[in-house]
Each structure stands twice: as structure tokens, then as C-alpha cells.
Amino acid sequence: MKKFLFILFLIIITNTIAMENKPSHHQSNGTFKNPAGSPERTGKVKWSWSTFNKEKKKLDMTVPKSHVLNKNEVLKNLELYKDKDYIGWIGHATFLIKLGNTTIITDPVFSKNAGPLIFGPKRYVDPALSLKEIPKVDLFLLTHNHYDHQDTATIRKFPYKDANVIVPLKLGKYFTKYNYKKVNELDWFQTIQVNDLKITLLPAVHWSKRSLTDTNKTLWGNFLIEYKNKKILFACDTGYGQIYK
């Protein structure tokens, strides 16, 4: 009995020391939390379809013409700037970024609906290009796992699975299951070099969830992209907090 208690004591001490050595956003239950000083998420969101539909009817859902990208113009510009650095908006949080010889895609979503089911929230504007029309991608950045940023259909059908994939902690499995070979998970403030680019995952004030049981079990973050004298911050759905002061 004494031996059992001693072993149990050692396990508790070891786990305590291990947690003390982990960053503050790592919680003992294996989940993550926002940086210190971030606003707290209070209460539970009360969802009502009747309220949602009632409030939706009050909104002007007309899409401004300037918000709809002309596909031919986008393709023309991609060809025109293929040997130059550029940032091209595809839709929502999806951008094509070219720096030197490296082409980056961010949070690509090419599906009609964002959600676990085919009838989830539907986008109002199609992406400027289809998956088949995007240029060769060398680097795939994913900020977090919400359905309007992490699109399973896009990940599964993505034509350039030899691209480097960089994701926050515990998101790599969503890529390796579809035979991506170069998948790297980063914690906040970790950096990785890809060709001539330096990619750093920075904190964000957000959260993660894809089901009823996985709240905050995967990390989220912003990406700092550095290339020569250029710096680009690609931010996920982040709130404001002490980290931005």
C-alpha cells in the first residue's frame, strides 16, 4: 500500500512539474486558453432559429457589386503578376500571397456551405477562383478549426498536397489523414523557415470548436509572415486584448 501511495505521489508531482513547465495557455485538461489579460467569454450563447430568421429579415442582404470579384480579371492579374510579389483576395479569409518563389494560401474555403453538414451556413459570394484554377501553392496556412476557416472538403480535394502545411497545435491530423506529407504544428511564438520565408505563430484572442465535445482542444493563432524587408500579419478571427497593446 505504501509503495502504491509513493508511486501515486510521484505521478502527481511529475504531472505538476510538467504543467509548470508548459506555457500559460496550456491547461491541465489538455485544452488551450487565451493569453493573459484577454476578455473572458461569459455565459452560453442562446441559439434560436426563430430569432435568427427574424433578425435576418431586418438586414439588407444585397451584395455590393464591388464585393464580387470578376474571375477573368483575377486570372488576368495572376498571370500579370506571376513573377512579382502580390496579395490576392479569393474570398472570406482565403488569400493567395506570393513572396519571392513561394506562393501561400490562407484558410482556404471553397465549399458553398460552412458547417459539419451540407446545409450549413451558405456563402453569399462564390470564391473568385475554383480549386482547379488556383496557381501552384507552396505553403498552406490554417489559423484555427472553425468551419468557415477549416473546410474539410477543400482539404480533401486540395490539388497541391505536396505543399508545406503549417497549423496550430493538434490540427495536423486533419491533413495527414488526407496524405499531406509536410505538416508542421506550431505553438505560439514558435517559428519555422519555409524557403526564404520565416513563419511565426502568434497568439490570438479566440477559441476553437467543431463539435459538442472538443471546445478549445486545438490551438488557434495569427501568422506573422516575414520575407526580406516585408512583414505580413495574417490574423484569424481575433478579438482585442492585452497582446495588441
Which residue ranges define each predicted feature?
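Active-site metal-binding loops of divalent metal-dependent hydrolases
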Residues: 108-110, 145, 204-205, 236-238
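Sec-dependent N-terminal signal peptides
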Residues: 4-13
